[in-house]
């Protein structure tokens, strides 16, 4: 049996939905946790509890890519040794793909429902083993973006200066 954990990540909290792939697609638990190491540890404890209770063969933790908010939970789960023994796959998916899947079902939108649809999205075999950027690549990404912004500002300043000289 597989366990799917859908996480709706925001700046302050992680809304989680724990779902199995059995014939009834059981939702084992839905809850909110803080977007902190304590909140991620609580989710980990429930995962370990469910893995013992239901003999989980593999584990998929899926979440939407939400800038920096999803980075820390993704790295926490990906680097955890106990979770890696459960045949773990952490996947960070583009929000527009999950939104299109969710739009098929006409239901109100809230964080708990979003977590359910994220888990369900990964349950129907849509998960891919996404590349979670390592720290070195993130630093390079930030430096590249900063350089790009500085160049744009420099060009804008030069244009402003030239306009003031000739007018």
Give residue ranges: language-model regions.
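Phosphate- and other anionic-substrate recognition elements at nucleic-acid/protein interfaces
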Residues: 1-167
């Amino acid at each position: 049996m597989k366990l799917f954990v859908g996480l709706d990540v925001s700046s302050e909290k992680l809304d989680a939905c724990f779902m199995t792939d059995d014939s009834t697609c059981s939702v084992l638990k839905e809850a909110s946790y803080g977007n902190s190491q304590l909140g991620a540890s609580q989710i980990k404890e429930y995962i370990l509890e469910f893995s013992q209770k239901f003999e989980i063969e593999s584990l998929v933790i899926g979440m939407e890519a939400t800038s920096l908010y999803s980075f820390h939970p993704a790295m926490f789960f990906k680097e955890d040794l106990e979770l890696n023994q459960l045949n773990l796959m952490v996947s960070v998916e583009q929000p527009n793909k999950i939104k299109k899947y969710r739009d098929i079902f006409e239901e109100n939108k809230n964080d708990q429902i979003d977590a359910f649809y994220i888990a369900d999205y990964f349950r129907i075999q849509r998960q891919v083993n996404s590349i979670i950027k390592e720290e070195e690549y993130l630093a390079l990404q930030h430096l590249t973006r900063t350089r790009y912004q500085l160049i744009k500002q420099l060009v804008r300043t030069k244009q402003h200066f030239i306009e003031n000289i000739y007018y």
